[in-house]
Design a protein with these regions (language model features):
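Short N-terminal binding/cap micro-motifs at the start of the first secondary-structure element
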Residues: 10-15, 39
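Short, solvent-exposed amphipathic alpha-helices that sit
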Residues: 14-24
Length: 177
């Protein structure tokens, strides 16, 4: 089970590419509204009806944090979001963040001693991190990726982490990527 946390201002490509490809890999995915409404509006005014409200979101194998401004600051300002992400990491469950969202992991000190990547210019927000030169990287229980342009690689990496190389390759081939 993967929970993708959405706040108003999220980056649509990063969130929806992840949801789509993970579902193609037959991974249970919930789009989780962290707002007061089940509908969340992305940074480019695409409105998405989420599957569940944050208060009703079950425990999961991975929390995915899409980027986007003001989506990332909106996620970061929600104590229930940061508490869940911190608990997820501390229990050695997986977290994934793309674009500006690794900033949240930095604020929670999850990036310390971990190889990560983020949107260029946000590196100083990744406290104690080892900044990767890769566009997408998994280290320990953390998967990160650079930007909307790496959303396909990010989603395929999550599939690889959760279901293995063969399933990731099958999904990749099925979309002719």
């Amino acid at each position: 089970m993967v929970n993708i946390f959405l706040a108003n201002g999220f980056e649509e490509v990063e969130a929806l590419t992840s949801a789509d490809l993970l579902r193609r890999a037959e991974i249970d995915v919930l789009l989780v509204s962290t707002e007061k409404d089940i509908y969340v509006t992305g940074n480019h005014n695409i409105c998405v009806k989420c599957d569940v409200m944050l208060a009703d979101a079950p425990d999961c194998d991975m929390i995915v944090l899409p980027g986007g401004i003001p989506g990332v600051p909106n996620l970061m300002s929600n104590k229930e979001v940061t508490d869940r992400v911190k608990k997820q990491s501390e229990s050695e469950q997986r977290v994934a963040a793309i674009c500006a969202a690794p900033w949240i992991l930095g604020e929670l000190k999850i990036t310390e001693g971990t190889e990560v990547i983020c949107y260029p210019g946000f590196e100083d927000k990744l406290k104690g991190a080892v900044i990767s030169t890769k566009s997408t990287v998994t280290d320990k229980n953390v998967t990160t990726s650079k930007a909307a342009g790496t959303a396909m690689d990010f989603a395929l990496e999550i599939i690889k982490v959760l279901k293995g190389d063969d399933v990731a390759l099958k999904v990749k081939n099925s979309i002719y990527y």
